[in-house]
Amino acid sequence: MMLVFQIALLVLVLYSLLLVVAVPVLYSSASDWSRAKNVILVGSLLWVLMVIGVGVLSFLK
């Protein structure tokens, strides 16, 4: 179970780093704002679910 938690935490950290780069780039691109808005929304929701999942795994370990 500890390995699953560590992998989930690593994925969360890497995804967070990806969002740190991707979100400002998407905000700065003026073209196709509706698509960028949807990508940011889905990416943020996925991040929240990952944080909750890591929290649950942390509680279970």
Swiss-Prot record:
GO terms for cellular component: photosystem II reaction center; plasma membrane-derived thylakoid membrane. Its main location: membrane. Keywords: Membrane, Photosynthesis, Photosystem II, Reaction center, Thylakoid, Transmembrane, Transmembrane helix. The keyword Thylakoid applies. It is found in: Cellular thylakoid membrane. Pfam families: Ycf9 (PF01737). The keyword Transmembrane applies. The chain crosses the membrane at residues 8-28, 41-61. It is a multi-pass membrane protein. GO terms for biological process: photosynthesis; photosystem II stabilization. PSII is composed of 1 copy each of membrane proteins PsbA, PsbB, PsbC, PsbD, PsbE, PsbF, PsbH, PsbI, PsbJ, PsbK, PsbL, PsbM, PsbT, PsbX, PsbY, PsbZ, Psb30/Ycf12, peripheral proteins PsbO, CyanoQ (PsbQ), PsbU, PsbV and a large number of cofactors. It forms dimeric complexes. Belongs to the PsbZ family. May control the interaction of photosystem II (PSII) cores with the light-harvesting antenna, regulates electron flow through the 2 photosystem reaction centers. PSII is a light-driven water plastoquinone oxidoreductase, using light energy to abstract electrons from H(2)O, generating a proton gradient subsequently used for ATP formation. This is Photosystem II reaction center protein Z. It comes from Synechococcus sp. (strain JA-2-3B'a(2-13)) (Cyanobacteria bacterium Yellowstone B-Prime). The gene is psbZ.
